[in-house]
């Protein structure tokens, strides 16, 4: 075998071992289904465009020959009522999930963009299991919020402001909350009680799984923004109904 053939064989072998991204929403729908996407326009929304997961969801639904209705959180109930048939799925921005859940009938599947990112980019079962660690936080526990991109923080930034505030309100504990941005992901994760990872929309599934495996190897639970927010808002079990194995993993972890 010549050097060129050897090199091609190595590249082909490596390519087969690299985990590919899963569909964000395409695995939950079929041709002809209707999906309601809830995309709030707030201070964190980019001017004149949608954020990447929202664009990705729309494209996947078009590729699946499904129909999508894009609304803000104050039009969910009205939009569902106007449909001739109930939507196959409602997918919302995590920050408005409690409001959307209140407007969505219980028999309509509900999820969030970030939870679907956990499915697409990482391992939603393992991250759901990690979410249970939030229920056992105590005073002085260290929590690490991990972001894969270095965006400019907003006035009411979700990772630096909202999640820490909601976490302290929910637990009533004096928590030490830190933020790691981009490549500043610690080698030693053992000081932390739990890791809260962003959706990872700008990185590959391989990158997210590397982080998840590093946490697992050190026995440190990892969850993500969407799972965390849904837990803090009291709707986690409902939004995990789309992923029964993840729901079971979360419930089992709570009882340990």
Question: Where does each model-flagged region fall?
Answer:
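Extended, compositionally biased non-globular segments
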Residues: 177-179
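Short beta-strand/loop segments at the ligand-binding rim of alpha/beta enzyme cores
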Residues: 172-175
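C-terminal-of-GTPase-core extension/linker across diverse P-loop GTPases
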Residues: 4-157, 166-168, 181-194, 202-217, ...
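A solvent-exposed beta-alpha-beta segment
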Residues: 161
């Amino acid at each position: 075998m010549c050097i060129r053939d050897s090199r091609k064989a190595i590249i082909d072998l490596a390519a087969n071992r690299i985990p590919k991204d899963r569909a964000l929403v395409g695995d939950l729908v079929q041709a002809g289904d209707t999906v309601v996407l809830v995309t709030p326009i707030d201070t964190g929304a980019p001017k004149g465009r949608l954020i990447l997961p929202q664009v990705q969801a729309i494209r996947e639904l078009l590729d699946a020959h499904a129909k999508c209705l894009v609304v803000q959180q104050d039009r969910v109930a009205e939009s569902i009522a106007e449909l001739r048939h109930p939507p196959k799925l409602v997918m919302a921005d995590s920050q408005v999930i409690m409001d959307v859940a209140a407007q969505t009938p219980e028999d309509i599947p509900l999820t969030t963009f970030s939870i679907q990112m956990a499915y697409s980019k990482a391992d939603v079962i393992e991250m759901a299991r990690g979410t249970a660690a939030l229920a056992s936080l105590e005073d002085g526990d260290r929590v690490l919020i991990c972001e894969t991109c270095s965006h400019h923080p907003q006035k009411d930034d979700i990772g630096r402001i909202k999640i820490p505030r909601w976490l302290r309100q929910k637990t009533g504990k004096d928590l030490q909350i830190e933020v790691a941005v981009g490549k500043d992901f610690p080698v030693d994760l053992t000081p932390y009680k739990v890791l809260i990872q962003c959706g990872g929309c700008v990185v590959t599934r391989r990158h997210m799984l590397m982080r998840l495996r590093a946490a697992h190897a050190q026995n440190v639970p990892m969850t993500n923004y969407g799972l965390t927010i849904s837990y803090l808002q009291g709707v986690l079990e409902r939004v995990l109904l789309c992923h029964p194995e993840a729901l079971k993993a979360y419930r089992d972890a709570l009882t340990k």
